[in-house]
Amino acid sequence: MPELNHSEAPLPFPILIGDIGGTNARFSIVVDAHSEPAHFPIVQTANFKTIDDAIEEALSKSAVRPRSAILAMAGPVRGDEIPLTNCDWVIRPKTMIANLGMEDVLIINDFEAQALAIAGISEEHRATIGEISEGMVASRAVLGPGTGLGVAGLVHAQHAWIPVPGEGGHIDLGPRSERDLRIWPHLETIEGRISAEQVLCGRGLQNLYHAICKTDGIEPSLKEPADITAHALAETNIQAEETLTLFVTYLGRVAGDIALVFMARGGVYITGGISQKILPALQKPEFRAAFEDKAPHTALLKSIPTHVVTHPLAALSGLTAYARAPASFGLATDGRRWRR
């Protein structure tokens, strides 16, 4: 791929790569631009007071000390103290440089890392939904229902991949069918509003299930999202089955909207643990039908492939790709990179 001309120097190797979630933190180290990353055991965030402590624990299992770090985290990156969503850690890059002996630290949004990953994702690490398997060499989009609903674009321009983070998970989600109109009054809202994330995430699955039960006039019997999906996939609970069917339908609607926003002719990718667990439901007709139901642009949506990312460490693979060849990506680093 032709490279962009960047005046900014690449981060020095070895580079620590980190994907920081609310529950788990995953680290690896990349020694140089040609070596495979060495992965460390998954770290539970609750077991460490600070991220620096967690990094020290990971590095205690390696003879290699990193000169720099690229970390992906949930939430916006602002200022010199960056609190994590759903975790008590606060990332302080200047302190990290001083305490861990690093020269350079770059912090980006977690879905930017997911967007970086889909730039070069191989066929073995994706499951295609629908009949279209290959898209154009063009912009892409990624969505991920998890703790929340992450959304990012990956714009292809000037011979490079440019990740575009945002808060697309908070777009409005409204009823369209008669059944939707009966269910919607029972959904929990935030300040009277129902966003996509209110339905399309782990707690959103619970929200939808409880609303369906209230609509049907029955007491909910399932508590956890995993229980709902398990009963739905096993076809042992009618309300759970409808919950999952509507979940993938609404995800298809939102994915289609995001595809239009980014003109994602290169494909739309669904990532995260939930999507992998409900893959059989996503491969049923409802997801693609909702994705394509975007008159007057139905023909356009029919031409756009959709995939579920099955790579177990997708974010780390995206960060590694950037670490090896930063000039191939148009990643904005202003206000997010700290040097000694």
UniProtKB/Swiss-Prot annotation:
InterPro entries: ATPase_NBD, Bacterial_glucokinase, Glucokinase. Belongs to the bacterial glucokinase family. GO terms for cellular component: cytosol. Gene3D superfamilies: 3.30.420.40, 3.40.367.20. Transmembrane segments: none annotated. Pfam families: Glucokinase (PF02685). ATP binds at residues 18-23. Disulfide bonds: none annotated. GO terms for molecular function: ATP binding; D-glucose binding; glucokinase activity. It is found in: Cytoplasm. One of its GO terms (biological process) is glycolytic process. Keywords: ATP-binding, Cytoplasm, Glycolysis, Kinase, Nucleotide-binding, Transferase. The keyword tRNA processing does not apply. This is Glucokinase.
